[in-house]
Amino acid sequence: MGIQAAEISAILKEQIKNFGQEAEVAEVGRVLSVGDGIARVHGLDNVQAGEMVEFPGGIRGMALNLEIDNVGVVIFGSDRDIKEGDIVKRTKSIVDVPVGDALLGRVVDGLGNPLDGKGPIETTERSIADVKAPGIIPRKSVHEPMATGLKSVDAMIPIGRGQRELIIGDRQTGKTAVALDTILNQKAYNDAAGDDESKKLYCVYVAVGQKRSTVAQLVKKLEETGAIEYSIVVAATASDPAPMQFLAPYAATSMAEFFRDNGRHALIIYDDLSKQAVSYRQMSLLLRRPPGREAYPGDVFYLHSRLLERSAKLGDDHGNGSLTALPIIETQGGDVSAFIPTNVISITDGQIFLETELFYQGIRPAVNTGLSVSRVGSSAQTNAMKSVAGPVKLELAQYREMAAFAQFGSDLDAATQQLLNRGARLTELMKQPQYSPLTNAEIVCVIFAGTKGYLDKIPVGDVGRYEKGLLAHLRGKHKGLLDYITKEDPKIKGEAEDKIRAALDEFAATFA
């Protein structure tokens, strides 16, 4: 078979005609050294601080240190495949993440890549991970309640939409349990809201430096209860590199801000910020930034303040949305005066202290009501809750003070004895099993029973049984009363008080 010269020339002409002239221009640099998740790169002269750069094999990094002769880049992934002399490209974009409704029900990493095996995330909207917090003018003071479903929190340490409330305690004191119960509690409210977005609350949970098994367990619980439908889980686990653990809270806040900025309401839980500070310290020391107190860098306060300031209640002109934050901090041996705990306490609008001592006494949630405080206070409570919850905090404070003295004296006068009896029953009443949040109306009725003397004749050991029976009685025979408290939100006096008293008297007659 002969070679067809005409055919070959035709093919060559065709190839030459269609030859693409467009050349891709990319600013590149070369890796000088790499190790411990940090790369030193030479040649990226115009790179911006916080810009995403790309290594061979699609591995991404972020430029953090801009020095005279090189750029310090933190690597979002394994640095094993990166070697000296590799080419690094600028992407010309600051680190951003996907946002939008498509993320609801998903588990993603700190860059928004899915981890749950449910396919890609169908959204075109993206947002920069580290954006500026809203200014003073767009904000409005916090006034709507954000119900946690926990009696001790909703009654004594109320949280409002747009507030930042710190959950602080040693390891194994139930910090995550409080946060998880808050997410589960929103299911009833979200289901009842229907299409009314102003009543719904979307939840974002950020796991920083936790075990993968712990995160998997949490996701399983959310799926079982159906709470995953209105939740996003962002996971940067203990096995992820430090830069991912540093970035995850910022990325998750951008996902939550999507709801805030569209006139909706969101809740974000950072579990926990101590581990984020540790990973930031690791990165800073490896980048040779000067260390400060406890070897943390000088800007570790700013690390947390710029993150938590993004949670806000926006005013009418800006869509009325809100973002509530529940940051979690783990203390060592109950030391709340360490560097990171004091920093975050000063940034937030209050804190819930959880104590090991109370936890082992069986008081769970182990909230120390004396040290816990909400700086928004009763402006974030419903009228009904406000009118019954006032006396509880005072009575428990008096009880704690008296209980300390009562250990020394045996002959106590009747008033002191009454105070101790009431306090013991209220303490018992504040206990609550995990995964069983209560509605606002149920908490109002239970606390009313506690403060108005309905428990005074009941042995302390039977308080839990009384409460269980009372809730079953209210849900079965007095659903109308619970609906009335929920919808009308009356002050508990006059007619409303009579209705609750009638229901409690009816139950008292059957309880034995």
UniProtKB/Swiss-Prot annotation:
- The entry's protein name is ATP synthase subunit alpha 2
Recorded hits in Pfam families, A to Z, give: ATP-synt_ab, ATP-synt_ab_C, ATP-synt_ab_N
Gene, per the UniProt record: atpA2
Its subunit composition reads: F-type ATPases have 2 components, CF(1) - the catalytic core - and CF(0) - the membrane proton channel. CF(1) has five subunits: alpha(3), beta(3), gamma(1), delta(1), epsilon(1). CF(0) has four main subunits: a(1), b(1), b'(1) and c(9-12).
What is the protein's species of origin?
Dinoroseobacter shibae (strain DSM 16493 / NCIMB 14021 / DFL 12)
Q: Where does ATP bind?
A: G169, D170, R171, Q172, T173, G174, K175, T176
Where does it localize? Answer: Cell inner membrane
Q: What is the lineage of its organism?
A: Bacteria, Pseudomonadati, Pseudomonadota, Alphaproteobacteria, Rhodobacterales
Similarity comment: Belongs to the ATPase alpha/beta chains family.
Q: Which Gene Ontology cellular-component terms appear in the entry?
A: plasma membrane; proton-transporting ATP synthase complex
